[in-house]
Amino acid sequence: MMRILLFLATNLAVVLVASITLRLLGVEPYLNANGLNMNSLLIFCFVIGMAGSLVSLFISKWMAKMSTKAKVIEQPGNATERWLLDTVGELARDAGIKMPEVAIFPAQQSNAFATGWNKNDALVAVSAGLLERMRPEEIRAVLAHEIGHVANGDMVTLALIQGVLNTFVMFFARIVAQLVDSFLRRDDEGGGLGFFGYMAVVIVAEIVFGLVASMVVAWFSRFREYRADAAGAKLAGSGAMINALARLKAETQMPDQMPDTLTAFAITTGQTRKLMERLFASHPPLDDRIRALKESAYRE
């Protein structure tokens, strides 16, 4: 509840700042005079922007199962599945959350992810390759990392941030289009953009603003990885968490087998070396994560 209240308060503050700034700059009266109601536009963009993000959140478990072909363990069929259920249950109790669904997905790359609209209605999944190649204490650390994501409410927070950014990408893209249209109509002979011209400007502006928004989301995603690593270290031990990340680092040359829609929720996405790749990366470099744990900079 506190997260929702903080989100609403932050969103209201951003709306007020944007409204005041546009009014002080004379943009709002100018646009209103040219037929664009700022408040109505903002409400429209908020509803559409948040709806898309929240729908994605609510169907995230279903989408994750479908896209990875994950098999939920309802009744353990072997000792490994029994151990997996017991370990997740123990970690969930220690983290103060309800038992999530546990699944295994068929990928040779060592990976895992957590998703779900609620920390008490989540899904934690690990790859078959991870179970084959990692030691039990390392698997436990990876599971603790994912439980940390769930306990921290990262999926919900990320969806809310994405919804706010969706709102402002749509909002400012249409303001830009309206300004261009009004500029072309500045005299009696100007015909403006027309419908297709207006939509073309909106699309281009949404792409530009969307790239900036993606960097913001990626920054938050990287930050939450450090927090999840810290939670994993707290639940499973720093040594085990560091060893698990080191094992993942050894596999960074293996092709990434995670669907694009789940890369932000996986424990690793491979290596990113170039500056632009780092700006849009959902995960920090594994070396940085290992260093942070060793220095206890992010340990909770």
Swiss-Prot record:
Active-site residues (renumbered): E146
Residues passing through the membrane, by range: 4-24, 40-60, 153-173, 193-213
Enzyme Commission number, as recorded: 3.4.24.-
Swiss-Prot/TrEMBL keywords: Cell inner membrane, Cell membrane, Hydrolase, Membrane, Metal-binding, Metalloprotease, Protease, Transmembrane, Transmembrane helix, Zinc
Pfam families named among the record's database cross-references: Peptidase_M48
Domain of life per record: Bacteria
Enzyme class (EC, first level): hydrolase
Alphabetical list of InterPro entries matching this protein: HtpX_protease, Pept_M48_protease_HtpX, Peptidase_M48
GO biological process, one term: proteolysis
Family as reported in the entry's similarity comment: Belongs to the peptidase M48B family.
Protein name (Swiss-Prot/TrEMBL): Protease HtpX
Organism: Chromohalobacter salexigens (strain ATCC BAA-138 / DSM 3043 / CIP 106854 / NCIMB 13768 / 1H11)
Gene behind the chain: htpX
